[in-house]
């Protein structure tokens, strides 16, 4: 395997390469680059203090499923606020995945809330402000725009959107998945209510044709009662657009 002459690189140059590979989303290449770094004590000491290198190591550890290493990096190094959002996402997602593996099923909102309470963000990647777990309006606007163009973005588009919103590709993918599920549920509910309205209208027409008067306040069947309620109220079907993860 070809290796770059890392020994001639300064810590700043190494950090620059890490940042470039991180932005490209090529985690595999980033991992190979990190493995090729020197092991000399002097060089390691300098690199271990560089935030870009530490952030790159955390990303590689997460994608490799090495969550113990990820937690060690995040808990033992103080990161600047610019890195907080991405590293917080890695911390939470890693704990979610461990909990899912342990329970043998996907986590629901309540499960995720309990995981967050059990494993709070370390102060090394958190400034103490309470996180709402809701996407900002600008982020939601961008996600909705992209969703209307393509509800099934490929990995490249997910990375592009992640960079534009400050989220991780995993968060972007989860948002699109949840939005598709909400839209399908709303469409199914809409079809059901339209069927109820249609059945209610048909019965009313038949009753009028037969000359049978309707008795106010008396429903001949549960279905008739349901259709009556549906016919006398305006129906508005909208898919939930909440991005809260509670």
From Swiss-Prot:
Pfam families the record matches: Homeodomain (PF00046), SIX1_SD (PF16878)
Listed Low complexity bias regions: 219-246
Disorder cited: Optic disk anomalies with retinal and/or macular dystrophy: An ocular disorder characterized by optic nerve dysplasia, optic disk anomalies, chorioretinal dystrophy and macular atrophy. Some patients have microphthalmia.
Keyword Ubl conjugation: no
Family listed: Belongs to the SIX/Sine oculis homeobox family.
Gene that this polypeptide is encoded by: SIX6
Gene Ontology MF term list: DNA-binding transcription factor activity, RNA polymerase II-specific; RNA polymerase II cis-regulatory region sequence-specific DNA binding; sequence-specific double-stranded DNA binding
Annotation: DNA-binding region: 128-187
Phosphoserine, modified sites: 221, 225, 227-228
Keywords: Cataract, Developmental protein, Disease variant, DNA-binding, Homeobox, Microphthalmia, Nucleus, Phosphoprotein
Organism field: Homo sapiens (Human)
Tissues with expression: Expressed in the developing and adult retina. Also expressed in the hypothalamic and the pituitary regions.
Subcellular location: Nucleus
Modified residue annotations for Phosphothreonine: 212
Protein name: Homeobox protein SIX6
């Amino acid at each position: 395997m070809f290796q770059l002459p890392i020994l001639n690189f300064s810590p700043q140059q190494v950090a620059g390469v890490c940042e470039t590979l991180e932005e490209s989303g090529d985690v595999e290449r980033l991992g190979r680059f990190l493995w090729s770094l020197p092991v000399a004590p002097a060089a390691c000491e300098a690199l271990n203090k560089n935030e870009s290198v530490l952030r790159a190591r955390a990303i590689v550890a997460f994608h490799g499923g090495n969550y113990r290493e990820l937690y060690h990096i995040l808990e033992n190094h103080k990161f600047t606020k610019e890195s907080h959002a991405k590293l917080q996402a890695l911390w939470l997602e890693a704990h979610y995945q461990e909990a899912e593996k342990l329970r043998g099923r996907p986590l629901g909102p309540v499960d995720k809330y309990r995981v967050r309470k059990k494993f709070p963000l370390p102060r090394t990647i958190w400034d103490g402000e309470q996180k709402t777990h809701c996407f900002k309006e600008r982020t939601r606007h961008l996600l909705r725009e992209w969703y209307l163009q393509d509800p099934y973005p490929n990995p490249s588009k997910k990375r592009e959107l992640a960079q534009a919103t400050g989220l991780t590709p995993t968060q972007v993918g989860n948002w699109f998945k949840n939005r598709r599920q909400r839209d399908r549920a709303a469409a199914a509910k809409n079809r059901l209510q339209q069927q109820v309205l249609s059945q209610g209208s048909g019965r009313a027409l038949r009753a009028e044709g037969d000359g049978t008067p309707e008795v106010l306040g008396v429903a001949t069947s549960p279905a008739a009662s349901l259709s009556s309620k549906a016919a006398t109220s305006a129906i508005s079907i909208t898919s939930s657009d909440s991005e809260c993860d509670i």
